[in-house]
């Protein structure tokens, strides 16, 4: 275990008077050196916060899962089982089922390495007394598995790129896959022949060709997915059999939300979205109205700034945000990867 690290447990206050936006993010935690690239999060059965660290920023650090307790202790829980062909794992979206099994999007191809192309997996980790007992490959051969949610015994996974599916426009196609929770060794081809591919979208922004990413369900069973490059959130309605009835742009306002990375939903039905490129977090109400809640300039995150936010999660009455802090480019506020490695926090209200 990594030595315990203290975190700040108080909620950030509204700072509308000091800032044009409703809130200013605050520091939630400094992460140890074994977690230079924090990403997806999920709440464990015992209430701990589990953080996936694909560690793209430092490949000498094995991809791992961190555990954060309610009293502020941060420890390394375990390394994620690697794919033998590549020698690494790349955990991004994660989710627990009711039995306490952890499902992981192992986005092998994120780095762009040729040997990892179309080698992405969905893993199911089974535990006994908090120790890994069995690793099951639910699906393999995936191009870019990213976000993951569980509903009614099914796994819903976003694939941010499906480059083998060609749209006449030449624009990027991405989609949502659905697997049974008990599936094993599903061979994905990343084509329209995949029976598990339930819907696709096109990313229309030619400057940012990166597709479906964040994913969340509301209480009614509507599925919401973020089309990253377009800064749009789609609402997908399904029948009782899980067949897609509609897939429409539900919320879009690029003045408030430029890119849609990880997403979560609060008890009031508001969807919180990490605006990765803009160093911001937005909140979308039940009517689809988007409001930017907080934004940071290029920063190192040491003062609680949103240092390229990757995913939010509601935990213990706050919104915790992972700071990916790695990708640069013309559309990104972030200019470099740097220490410290952080999680930020926002108030729910």
Model-predicted regions and their roles:
Residues 57-62, 109-120, 164-174, 228-231, ...:
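Short, solvent-exposed loop/turn segments at conserved positions within beta-propeller repeat blades
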Residues 16-35:
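A short helix->beta-strand "capping" segment at the edge of beta-propeller domains
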Residues 3-19:
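Bacterial Sec-dependent signal peptides at the C-terminal "C-region" and cleavage site
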Residues 33-48, 55, 61-62, 82-102, ...:
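Beta-rich, blade/repeat-based domains predominating
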Residues 125-130, 179-189, 236-243, 348-349:
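Short loop/turn segments immediately following beta-strands, especially the blade-tip
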Residues 308-349:
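Blade-level signature of beta-propeller repeat domains, shared across WD40, Kelch, NHL, RCC1
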């Amino acid at each position: 275990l990594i030595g315990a690290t203290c975190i700040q447990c108080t909620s950030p206050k509204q700072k509308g008077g000091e800032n044009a936006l409703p809130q200013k993010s605050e520091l939630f935690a400094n992460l140890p050196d074994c977690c230079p690239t924090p990403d997806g999060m999920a709440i464990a059965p015992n209430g701990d916060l589990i953080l996936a660290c694909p560690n793209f920023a430092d490949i000498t650090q094995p991809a791992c899962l961190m555990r954060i307790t309610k009293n502020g202790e941060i420890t390394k829980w375990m390394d994620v089982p690697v794919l033998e062909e590549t020698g690494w794992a790349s955990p991004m979206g994660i989710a627990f089922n009711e039995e306490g099994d952890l499902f992981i999007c192992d986005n092998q191809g994120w780095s762009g390495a040729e040997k990892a192309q179309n080698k992405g997996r969905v893993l199911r980790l089974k535990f006994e007394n908090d120790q890994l007992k069995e690793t099951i490959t639910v699906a393999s051969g995936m191009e870019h598995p990213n976000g993951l949610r569980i509903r009614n015994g099914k796994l819903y996974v976003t694939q941010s790129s499906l480059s083998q599916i060609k749209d006449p426009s030449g624009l990027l196609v991405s989609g949502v896959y659905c697997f049974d929770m008990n599936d094993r060794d599903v061979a994905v081809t990343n084509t329209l022949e995949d029976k598990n591919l339930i819907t696709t979208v096109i990313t229309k922004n030619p400057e940012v060709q990166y597709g479906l990413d964040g994913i969340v369900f509301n209480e009614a069973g509507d599925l919401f997915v973020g089309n990253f490059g377009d800064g749009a959130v789609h609402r997908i309605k399904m029948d009782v059999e899980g067949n897609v009835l509609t897939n429409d742009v539900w919320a879009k306002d690029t003045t408030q939300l430029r890119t849609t990375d990880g997403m979560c939903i609060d008890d009031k039905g508001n969807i919180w979205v990490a605006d990765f490129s803009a160093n911001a977090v937005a909140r979308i109400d039940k009517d689809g109205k988007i409001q930017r809640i907080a934004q940071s300039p290029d920063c190192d995150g040491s003062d609680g700034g949103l240092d390229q936010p990757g995913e939010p999660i509601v935990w213990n009455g706050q919104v915790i945000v992972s700071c990916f802090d790695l990708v640069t480019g013309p559309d990104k506020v972030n200019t470099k990867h740097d220490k410290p490695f952080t999680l930020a926090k926002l108030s729910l209200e």
